[in-house]
């Protein structure tokens, strides 16, 4: 259950034949308009993010701080129908508003996630497009990068403990992969990309499903390393996870 937050602000807007709304953190943004979510509007201050994902993400040098802009994109077979349009089911169920509120709830629970700044949707007929703007984490590298460069020296145990912490809080991450786990030089870790994530009562089934997805992503990214090498590293991660889970953090 994501609680109400009085520091959120909501503003409607129209664009072309569509209409939408922007949900934003009024402690960080004095006002918000649709231009926040347009890389073209940012011009040279917006640079594409290369690693992971389906495109549609930019680093933005904004007056309110370094940020990341992500436009929601579909994958798989659904992308053949529409790359960036989703079926309208109500404002509260838009991908952007749901992720914005989930991230704010995780921050309230003292979990290491980027701070969301603003989310929007634009409805046209039965569909809508959406985008999310959040703080950028500085000087971090993904677990995918660590694994490819350092192999056995990657932060496997730290990753296991980090995931256990989120699972203890009830986060079911819909896309737990090696690109969505970040570490800085001091070993502090973060999770990112909470699209379709939900808070649940902790249960073995969904926790193991999250971990299995991460294992598959590590195998996919193994490069010249053998499957046996990857499995050994994952076992280190899993052991640390189980120990942290058993201790309650």
Curated annotation (Swiss-Prot):
Active site: 175
Reactions that this protein is recorded to catalyse: an alpha-Kdo-(2->6)-lipid IVA + ATP = a 4-O-phospho-alpha-Kdo-(2->6)-lipid IVA + ADP + H(+)
Keyword Nucleotide-binding recorded: yes
Classification via InterPro entries: KDO_kinase (IPR022826), Kinase-like_dom_sf (IPR011009)
Keywords, comma-separated and alphabetical: ATP-binding, Cell inner membrane, Cell membrane, Kinase, Lipopolysaccharide biosynthesis, Membrane, Nucleotide-binding, Transferase
Annotated membrane topology: Peripheral membrane protein
EC number: 2.7.1.166
Subcellular localization(s) per the UniProt record: Cell inner membrane
GO MF term list: ATP binding; kinase activity; phosphotransferase activity, alcohol group as acceptor
Pfam family, one: Kdo
Pathway the protein takes part in: Bacterial outer membrane biogenesis; LPS core biosynthesis
GO biological process, one term: lipopolysaccharide core region biosynthetic process
GO CC terms: plasma membrane
Domain of life the protein comes from: Bacteria
Function text: Catalyzes the ATP-dependent phosphorylation of the 3-deoxy-D-manno-octulosonic acid (Kdo) residue in Kdo-lipid IV(A) at the 4-OH position.
Family, per entry: Belongs to the protein kinase superfamily. KdkA/RfaP family.
Name of this protein: 3-deoxy-D-manno-octulosonic acid kinase
Biological source species: Xanthomonas campestris pv. campestris (strain ATCC 33913 / DSM 3586 / NCPPB 528 / LMG 568 / P 25)
């Amino acid at each position: 259950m994501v609680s109400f937050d009085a520091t959120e602000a909501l503003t409607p807007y129209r664009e072309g034949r569509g209409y939408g709304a922007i949900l934003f953190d009024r402690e960080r943004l004095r006002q918000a308009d649709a231009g926040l979510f347009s890389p073209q509007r940012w011009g040279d201050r917006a640079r594409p993010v290369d690693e992971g994902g389906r495109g549609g993400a930019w680093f933005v040098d904004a007056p309110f701080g370094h940020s990341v802009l992500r436009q929601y994109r579909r994958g798989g077979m659904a992308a053949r129908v529409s790359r960036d349009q989703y079926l309208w089911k109500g404002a509260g169920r838009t991908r952007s508003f749901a992720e914005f509120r989930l991230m704010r709830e995780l921050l309230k629970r003292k979990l290491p996630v980027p701070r969301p700044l603003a989310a929007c949707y634009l409805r046209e007929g039965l569909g809508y497009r959406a985008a999310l703007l959040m703080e950028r984490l500085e000087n971090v590298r993904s677990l995918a990068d660590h694994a490819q460069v350092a192999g056995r020296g990657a932060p496997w145990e730290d990753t296991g403990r980090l995931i256990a912490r989120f699972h203890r809080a009830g986060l079911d991450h819909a896309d737990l992969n090696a690109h969505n786990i970040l570490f800085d030089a001091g070993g502090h870790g973060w999770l990112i990309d909470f699209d379709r994530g939900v808070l649940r009562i902790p249960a073995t089934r969904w926790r193991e499903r999250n971990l299995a997805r991460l294992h598959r992503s590590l195998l996919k990214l193994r490069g010249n390393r053998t499957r046996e090498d990857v499995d050994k590293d994952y076992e280190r991660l899993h052991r640390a996870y189980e120990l942290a889970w058993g201790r309650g953090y």
